């Protein structure tokens, strides 16, 4: 890396053979790698949108910012991200989602799938331990089926197979379909991690909470989930 050749000159790359990497393609196609097929003159928009999202991701890792206002910040940043990337107002050129790519799309897919999948994973983990056979069976089938399918297959089905089963004239944007597929896939894996934390808690705590007259959701919110989630933080990270 230290002796890498950033030029696209074949002669310079041959001279440096065995000393460093030839990164001519990186220098030549850097913008394509970072921003995909987004219009060249408008690439400041994905740069700004990605920077704001990265700053929020970094802030979310600091315990100082763990307040209810952080949820509002996430909603505001996502709204800003989509508005800036799509455009179509205030003189901004409209750019369809099919032309999004590179770093902005990667950050969006990763962050949205994790943020949305986490509460869904909690519900799936609780459902797998439910006393109601119907709920428990449905959660088990969903989790085991999704975990048994590779992510690339989920993305392929969301992108190409799902539209074939849609009613004629009905169309869902490919970005939305991919987000749904990745969210469900992530939720299935997180559900198993969270279920491990739920099983690690002593049953005596739940029995004591029942004896105090607490409802099911009060027990989960105040006793079970805070401890279970704390136990599985290393596995989630």
Give residue spans per PLM region:
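Transmembrane alpha-helices and adjacent helix-loop boundaries
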Residues: 1-237
């Amino acid at each position: 890396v230290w002796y890498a050749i950033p030029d696209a000159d074949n002669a310079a790359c041959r001279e440096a053979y065995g000393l460093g990497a030839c990164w001519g393609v990186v220098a030549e196609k850097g913008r394509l790698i970072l921003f995909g097929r987004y219009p060249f003159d408008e690439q400041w928009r994905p740069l700004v949108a990605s920077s704001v999202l990265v700053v929020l991701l970094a802030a979310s890792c600091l315990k100082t910012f763990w307040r209810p206002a952080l949820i509002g910040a996430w909603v505001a940043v996502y709204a800003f991200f989509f508005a800036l990337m799509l455009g179509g107002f205030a003189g901004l050129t409209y750019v369809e989602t099919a032309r999004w790519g590179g770093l902005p799309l990667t950050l969006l897919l990763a962050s949205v799938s994790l943020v949305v999948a986490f509460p869904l994973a909690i519900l799936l983990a609780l459902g797998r331990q439910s006393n109601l056979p119907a709920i428990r069976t449905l959660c088990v089938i969903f989790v085991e089926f999704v975990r048994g399918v590779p992510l690339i297959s989920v993305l392929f089905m969301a992108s190409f197979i799902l539209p074939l089963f849609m009613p004629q004239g009905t169309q869902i944007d490919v970005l939305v379909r991919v987000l749904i597929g990745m969210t469900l896939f992530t939720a299935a894996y997180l559900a198993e991690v969270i279920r491990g934390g739920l099983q690690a808690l002593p049953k005596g705590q739940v029995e004591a909470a029942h004896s105090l007259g607490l409802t099911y959701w009060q027990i989960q919110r105040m006793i079970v989930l805070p401890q279970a989630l704390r136990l599985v933080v290393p596995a989630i990270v």
